[in-house]
Amino acid sequence: MADFKLTYATMFNPPEELHTGFDKAVEALKKNMGKEYGMFINGKEVLADEKFDDTSPVNTSWVLAKMQKGNASHATQAIAAARKAFPEWSHTPWQKRVEYLRKAASLIEQRIFELGAAMALEVGKNRMESLGDVQETADLIYYSCYQMEKNDGYVVEMGKDPLVGYEARNVSVLRPYGV
């Protein structure tokens, strides 16, 4: 599968390894159905008092996972954590942020079968659409990274001031906005 690139145009004739990998991932996922998962707030797993069952539209008797029912306090904690992290992230050079995002995209690609199987069971998409969506997610991140590099971090020189006798340097700079 090394030379096969999954796209919406190629999904109609994929190599057999794509089906085999997906089938194995579905079986592994089914073995863990019903497991409880916490929320992640400020880098820590947080459990809520209330839970809910995440069921599959493929078979509504399948409980895929027991999830946390977050409340306003959890949302406030998550927003506070994001605000706390923002200054460091916004001062991280764009090249380093691109490096982190490329690593995230690579991890998504490495876990394409696991993520695709989870999407198929949770959303009810067929295997090729779910695998295609996972690959498209990685590709979108790669594209954003490419655009950042192509545009030098989106530091773009703007037009000269047209007024006679005035000299101004106008620059457009893309920066993280915050929480």
What role is predicted for each listed range?
Residues 1-63:
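Hydrophobic face of amphipathic alpha-helices that form TPR/SEL1-like repeat modules
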Residues 39, 149, 174:
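Short glycine- and Lys/Arg-enriched binding-loop motifs that mark or flank ligand-binding interfaces
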Residues 154-179:
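Conserved small-residue-rich beta-alpha loop and adjacent elements
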Residues 33, 41-42, 123, 152, ...:
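Short glycine-rich loop/turn motifs that provide flexible caps or phosphate-binding loops at active sites
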Residues 1-17, 135, 139-153, 171:
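C-terminal segments
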Residues 55, 59-156:
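Glycine-rich loop-to-alpha-helix module at the N-terminal edge of alpha/beta enzyme cores
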